[in-house]
Amino acid sequence: MSRHDELIRLRHMRDFTAEAIAISNGKERDDLTTDRLLELALIRLMEVIGEAAGRISSDTRAQLPDIPWSDVVAMRNRLIHGYDSVDHDILWDTITHDLPPLLRAVDQLIQQLSEE
């Protein structure tokens, strides 16, 4: 995979992660139960983040071993294949606690790769 393709996928991860964080700001966990559009939007964003992560090469992943790459991809798989039993507590916890550091790490990796 070319450096250009890697950067595109990392930018997708960054942009969709930032969007999930922005959409969840000012919301609470219970809103996932009462706001169907919020639920669907956040699930879709998490699916795309995981899909993009799954397309990042192992060489690029190795540059930031602090990112739990396999967990990001596993979340995508769980949401896609377990579409009928999404655990809102896990989804909310992931978005509110795990995405902000993921955003910073991916942004850092994009900057590193852009400078090389």
Q: Residue locations for each model-derived region?
A:
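Solvent-exposed interaction patches of small proteins and small membrane subunits
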Residues: M1-E116
